[in-house]
Amino acid sequence: ADLGYGPATPAAPAAGYTPATPAAPAGADAAGKATTEEQKLIEKINAGFKAALAGAGVQPADKYRTFVATFGPASNKAFAEGLSGEPKGAAESSSKAALTSKLDAAYKLAYKTAEGATPEAKYDAYVATLSEALRIIAGTLEVHAVKPAAEEVKVIPAGELQVIEKVDAAFKVAATAANAAPANDKFTVFEAAFNDEIKASTGGAYESYKFIPALEAAVKQAYAATVATAPEVKYTVFETALKKAITAMSEAQKAAKPAAAATATATAAVGAATGAATAATGGYKV
């Protein structure tokens, strides 16, 4: 008989998979270790996954049972430790609940995918499905590395850069609203909240995210990424894709500010030098 369903537990893709080393997430300390409770939980689950994967080097027919037998207890322990502390406030409590819900959905989806498979294929189907879902969830916590901003966003006009911070804030508000909505309503709730927040933060100057071409393209790309996705993780895929795009835009903005300042300083210096040279030769300045 199959092992019964338990709390959310991550896994790995099938053959040939090598676990990626998590990058230092936003909010990590100097040593690159996670600092938020959610990031700490994901790190513990990743550690348990690696141990279970290493221990699954058995006959194909026994891989699934061996993996779950090792990973289940490690995962449950991580959850017990991660959720045992008293939340520091409503925000942290809500964040933990959202993460737990996503992990739970990921586990159920992987378990369902493996139903009916032959013993040899059961392990591959289970870990491949759950690994992809967990990769997406980890992405929302910025646990894994993302591409440099230059690779994500080629060029963002100066006018657009000025509002990226407001867009980022609007995204967070919309994501919070969507996380509290029923699964079938998450897309609608997110887009409505996203647009409302952008309109409010710009004093009504803009009605929606579509005033930024690069952002509109990112939203369309994020929606496209969900086409072949199971309903249980559909919104999570969208949220991750859009978050990645906005993060890249934000990083590009940070890089653009010092560059613009340096250019302005250089221009002023050249102007001053030119003026001084003109005056020295008895000429004039406009």
Curated annotation (Swiss-Prot):
It is found in: Secreted. Residues 1-35 are annotated as: Disordered. The keyword Acyltransferase does not apply. Keywords: Allergen, Secreted. InterPro entries: Poa_pIX/Phl_pVI, Pollen_allergen/Os. The keyword Secreted applies. Residues 1-34 have a biased composition (Low complexity). Its main location: secreted. SUPFAM superfamilies: Group V grass pollen allergen. One of its GO terms (cellular component) is extracellular region. Belongs to the Poa p IX/Phl p VI allergen family. This is Pollen allergen Phl p 5a. It comes from Phleum pratense (Common timothy).
